[in-house]
Regions:
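Short glycine/proline- and acidic residue-enriched helix-loop micro-motifs
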Residues: 8-9, 68-73, 129-130
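Electropositive phosphate-/nucleotide-binding environments in soluble metabolic enzymes
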Residues: 13-17, 21, 59, 63, ...
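Short beta-strand-loop/turn "lid" adjacent to the catalytic site in phosphate-handling enzymes
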Residues: 27, 33-79, 100, 106-115
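Phosphate-binding/catalytic loop of phosphoryl-transfer enzymes
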Residues: 80-175
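Short glycine-rich, Thr/Ser-proximal phosphate-binding strand/loop in the N-terminal lobe
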Residues: 1-14
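A generic local structural motif
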Residues: 29-32, 86-88
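Short, well-ordered amphipathic alpha-helical segments that serve as non-catalytic structural scaffolds
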Residues: 18-31, 143-146
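Alpha-helix termini
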Residues: 31-35, 150-153
Length: 175
C-alpha cells in the first residue's frame, strides 16, 4: 500500500531475483508507484534469523558477512540459506544500494551464560555452538519498546514478559 493505493499481485516467483524485479516494477510504475527510480532507495533491510555469537547488532552486509552467514547456516538451516539467497538477489537487482542485516538473535545477545548455557557437556557449546540463543528478537524488541512507551516508563526500568505469536512462537523475559 502506498499513497492510499493498494496493489496486489498474486504470483509465484521461481527465484528471489524475479520477485525483487517485480517489486521494482510495482514501486516504479502504475498505481503502486512510490518512486521514480531505485536510486531513491537509501538502503535495503534483511531480517536474518540467526547471527550466532558473531553478530550482536545490525550491520552492513559485506562479502565477509555473507560468508559468516553461510558458516552459521547449520544453526538455522531452514532460514539462513534462504536469507542469503534474498540478500544476493537484492544485491543483483538493486545494485550498489547498501544492504543491512538485522539479526533476530541480536536482541538476546546480552543474556548471561547462566541463562544461555544448557546442562550438557561444555564441549558441545565450544565445538558445536549448542546454547540458548533466543529467537524473534526483532519482534520482542519492538514490543518491549512499545510497552515502555505505552507505560510511559524508561525501558531500562521495566521487567517485561513479551510474546511473539506467528508462524513460530516464543516468550521472552526482558530485564
Amino acid at each position: 500500500e502506498a499513497n492510499g493505493n493498494k496493489a496486489t499481485t498474486p504470483a509465484i516467483f521461481p527465484t528471489h531475483t524475479e520477485a525483487f524485479a517485480e517489486v521494482v516494477k510495482k514501486m516504479t510504475t502504475g498505481d503502486g508507484k512510490v518512486i521514480d527510480d531505485v536510486s531513491e532507495i537509501n538502503a535495503i533491510g534483511h531480517r536474518v534469523v540467526h547471527g550466532g555469537e558473531k553478530f550482536q547488532a545490525s550491520c552492513l552486509i559485506t562479502p565477509e558477512v555473507i560468508e559468516t552467514l553461510r558458516e552459521l547456516s547449520p544453526l538455522a538451516p531452514l532460514h539462513n540459506p534462504a536469507g542469503i539467497l534474498g540478500i544476493e538477489a537484492a544485491k543483483k537487482v538493486f545494485g550498489d544500494i547498501p544492504n543491512v542485516a538485522v539479526f533476530d538473535t541480536a536482541f538476546h545477545s546480552t543474556m548471561p551464560p547462566k541463562a544461555f548455557m544448557y546442562a550438557i557437556p561444555y564441549e558441545y557449546y565450544e565445538k558445536y555452538g549448542v546454547r540458548r540463543y533466543g529467537f524473534h528478537g526483532t519482534s520482542h524488541k519492538y514490543v518491549s519498546y512499545r510497552a515502555a512507551e505505552y507505560l510511559e516508563e524508561p525501558i531500562d526500568r521495566l521487567k517485561l514478559i513479551t510474546c511473539h505469536l506467528g508462524n513460530g512462537s516464543s516468550i521472552a523475559a526482558v530485564d
